[in-house]
């Protein structure tokens, strides 16, 4: 219950109550086949969060880590979970929760890739998929479960998912899960796990809901917190275009595309109806466009994401569903057709463009009514969003 006083972080990029910082994967006392998987995945040296968080997690400590998209946080808990799993025990030992199906599948893929040389089984237990697949996986003794709160709780309550051997419970994007209607389900899952279960909580921000979990369920957690001022991604150039009125946005978008050469872009809108409107308008102008939102069937969403990753679709239009955790490597441009209704989602949207040092550009369409919100975003992240220069095309040359 040692989370007292975690409210505002005043100094330093990382503030922690844990002193060990490890600068090489080889020095983390990991299983050789995990290190092999890490290097095979493309990592060379640990990121700041990995240098600080992997060791206490693998030691079995409860950990509260604040890190935004693009810092290597998924690999942080993936590596740690793979290290703690007993490969010879065919029972679920690690449970990872994520707010969306897409993020859960992304995490599963990272576990599979880094765990390539281990005999560890992993399963995604998510809504929108066949329940019989879930039941079969749990009966076979899957060792790591990645899931969304509703489906996971259902599997536990139906007694297909036996939790008695679970030793790690990891919550990714905890701020999003706890603020979007999952709180009661997550609390119920907590209560159905062994009391000795290690808790690892990762969150881009630290709202009261997250701090409450640390006091209720965590035992003297190691705290690794990123200063709020630093919660903007380096390498992302941020601009705005004052479009004055909503009605002028589409013409502005077409003009923008006339002046730049972009491999792929993600465009964010705030509503499903706006996504559909913009998709239809762009198709009328002969753009190759895909659209994704929460109301699409899971299979259709998977197909759309696959097409976009392969490059057969050049523009992906999305609601905030996509704004957390989908790693689309080749995206160089993010356009906020609408500023996010929740300023805490801004970082997840623009983080799509330049992960792990890859450069990216974020362009915000701002009506006269949006100027105040944009200033709030600047203040919240201690960042500056500059007016888009006339020679914007030079950034994409």
Swiss-Prot record:
GO CC annotations, alphabetized: cytoplasmic stress granule
Keyword line: ATP-binding, Cytoplasm, Helicase, Hydrolase, Initiation factor, Nucleotide-binding, Protein biosynthesis, RNA-binding
SMART domains cross-referenced by the UniProt entry: DEXDc, HELICc
Subcellular location: Cytoplasm
Any one Gene Ontology molecular-function term assigned to this protein's record: RNA helicase activity
PROSITE patterns assigned: DEAD_ATP_HELICASE (PS00039), HELICASE_ATP_BIND_1 (PS51192), HELICASE_CTER (PS51194), Q_MOTIF (PS51195)
Domain Helicase C-terminal, first and last residues per copy: 235-396
Matching CDD domains: SF2_C_DEAD
Catalytic reaction annotation: ATP + H2O = ADP + phosphate + H(+)
Binding site for ATP: 67-74
Motif interval(s): Q motif: 23-51
Main location group: cytoplasm
InterPro entries in the record: DEAD/DEAH_box_helicase_dom (IPR011545), Helicase_ATP-bd (IPR014001), Helicase_C-like (IPR001650), P-loop_NTPase (IPR027417), RNA-helicase_DEAD-box_CS (IPR000629), RNA_helicase_DEAD_Q_motif (IPR014014)
Residue ranges constituting the Helicase ATP-binding domain according to the UniProt record: 54-224
Example GO biological process: cytoplasmic translational initiation
Motif DEAD box: chain residues: 172-175
Subunit comment: Component of the eIF4F complex, which composition varies with external and internal environmental conditions. It is composed of at least eIF4A, eIF4E and eIF4G.
Functional summary from the UniProt entry: ATP-dependent RNA helicase which is a subunit of the eIF4F complex involved in cap recognition and is required for mRNA binding to ribosome. In the current model of translation initiation, eIF4A unwinds RNA secondary structures in the 5'-UTR of mRNAs which is necessary to allow efficient binding of the small ribosomal subunit, and subsequent scanning for the initiator codon.
Domain notes: The Q motif is unique to and characteristic of the DEAD box family of RNA helicases and controls ATP binding and hydrolysis.
Membership in a protein family: Belongs to the DEAD box helicase family. eIF4A subfamily.
Name this protein carries in UniProt: ATP-dependent RNA helicase eIF4A
Gene (UniProt): TIF1
């Amino acid at each position: 219950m040692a989370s007292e006083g975690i409210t505002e972080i005043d100094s330093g990029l990382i503030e922690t109550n844990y002193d060990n910082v490890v600068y090489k994967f080889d020095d983390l006392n990991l299983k050789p086949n995990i290190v092999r998987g890490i290097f095979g995945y493309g990592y060379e040296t640990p990121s700041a969060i990995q240098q600080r968080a992997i060791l206490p997690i693998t030691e079995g400590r409860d950990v509260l880590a604040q890190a935004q998209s693009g810092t290597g946080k998924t690999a942080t808990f993936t590596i740690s979970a793979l290290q703690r799993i007993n490969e010879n025990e065919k029972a679920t030992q690690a449970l990872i929760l994520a707010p969306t199906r897409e993020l859960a599948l992304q995490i599963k893929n990272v576990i599979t890739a880094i765990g390539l040389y281990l005999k560890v089984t992993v399963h995604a237990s998510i809504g929108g998929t066949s329940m019989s697949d879930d039941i079969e996986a749990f009966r076979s003794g899957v060792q790591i479960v990645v899931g969304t709160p509703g489906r996971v709780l259902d599997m536990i309550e139906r007694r297909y998912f036996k939790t008695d051997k679970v030793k790690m419970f990891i919550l990714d994007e905890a701020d999003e899960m706890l603020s979007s209607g999952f709180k009661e389900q997550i609390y119920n899952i907590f209560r159905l796990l062994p009391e000795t279960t290690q808790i690892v909580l990762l969150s881009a921000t630290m709202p009261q809901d997250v701090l409450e979990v640390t006091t209720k369920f965590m035992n003297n957690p190691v705290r690794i917190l990123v200063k709020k001022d630093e919660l903007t991604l380096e390498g992302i150039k941020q601009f705005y275009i004052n479009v004055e009125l909503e009605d002028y946005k589409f013409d502005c978008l077409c003009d923008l595309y006339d002046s730049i050469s972009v491999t792929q872009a993600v465009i964010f809108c705030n509503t499903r109806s706006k996504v559909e409107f913009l998709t239809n308008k762009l198709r009328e102008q002969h753009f190759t466009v895909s659209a994704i939102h929460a109301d699409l069937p899971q299979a259709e969403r998977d197909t759309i994401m696959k097409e976009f990753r392969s490059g057969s679709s050049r523009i992906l239009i999305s609601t905030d569903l996509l704004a957390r955790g989908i790693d689309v490597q080749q995206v160089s441009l993010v356009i906020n057709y609408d500023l996010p209704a929740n300023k805490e989602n801004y970082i997840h949207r623009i983080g799509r463009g330049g992960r792990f040092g890859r450069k990216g550009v974020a362009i915000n369409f701002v009506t006269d009514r949006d100027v105040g919100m944009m200033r709030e975003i600047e203040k919240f992240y201690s960042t500056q969003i500059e007016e888009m220069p006339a020679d914007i095309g030079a950034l994409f040359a």
